[in-house]
Amino acid sequence: KNVTVQFGGLFALSDLSFEIIGGEILGLIGPNGAGKTTVFNVLTGVYNATQGDVQFEGKSILKKRPYEIFAKGIARTFQNIRLFSNMTALENAMVARHCRTNTGVMGAIFKTPSQKREEAAIRAKALEALVFMNVDNYADTVAANLPYGSQRRLEIARALASEPKVLLLDEPAAGMNPAESTELMKDIARISKTGIDVLLVEHDMKVVT
């Protein structure tokens, strides 16, 4: 609400207000340099707003760290793909899922029964996310070796593995061919139908509409 982000004398955002209503796909459009990615960075705690407030479930998250906001249920993808390139697709999704675990460091070190059960549950949920985004056939493939379009889908799957309440997609169809973009539109609609609110930044108006 009334968010302003200022870097020196430059206003990246000026008095921006909007609300995500439950169950909707909200599109954020604008030319390059308009501040769309800055909005995502404020929502996820990468940037602090100079003025204004950001609320999630009725509480301010303005001073929260990115990992705290992620754990609360706001996940994102990036305009430039940011996968763990040397890890498999399944391992990428499992990393995101760890925000929902309870086992501590000692359990991980000593491989306690509860830790083993939790790790199995993490693997199952991560694989479920890969299946949802149709990249489960790459589960054991190193992320860097996936086709470009599948890397895009994997990044979304990784975000979904955290069971977000709000999903921020920063130009998810960038670099995709028309057929891939069409399939992605269907997937975004399916994501929304699961009850996840989607905020979408995209230059391709076919994806936004």
Where are these regions (language model features)?
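Glycine-rich phosphate-binding loops of nucleotide-dependent enzymes
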Residues: 1-209
